[in-house]
Amino acid sequence: MTSREQVSRFIRSSFRSVWSLEVLLLLKRERRPWTDAEIVTALRASDLIVSQSVSALGDAGLVVTDAAGRTEYRPASEDAARLVEEAERLYAGSPDAVRRLILNASSSGLAAFADAFRLRKD
């Protein structure tokens, strides 16, 4: 079994938004090739959110998109598949905790960027 810390690291590094996690779980739950339009309809999301999520999930090695633009769940490794399973379990049991992990990971980059412009007294 994978440790909670490994799952937390995986969630923070793999999902730029909660939407990305929702897209992945949809593709995992209904294993078939999906067009972006079908994902938009199923999740009631925007085209932009879905295209960014699919791109990020592909970069993370969790989905593949064919030449026709259809995307399906296909983790690059057994370890990645196991981490997805654990992330799904954690999200089902503690959705707020998972949302905080994702939001804190994305906002830490913003905080660092903002800090670069903070005026300091010398």
Where do the language-model regions lie?
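Short amphipathic alpha-helical interaction segments
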Residues: 44-59
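Hydrophobic structural patches
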Residues: 26-27
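Amphipathic alpha-helical dimerization/coiled-coil segments
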Residues: 83-122
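Short acidic, hydrophobic short linear motifs in intrinsically disordered regions
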Residues: 23, 32-42
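A short, conserved structural fragment
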Residues: 58-70
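Short alpha-helical segments that sit at the start of domains
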Residues: 1-22
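Short, cationic-aromatic polyanion-contact patches
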Residues: 11-18, 35, 67-89
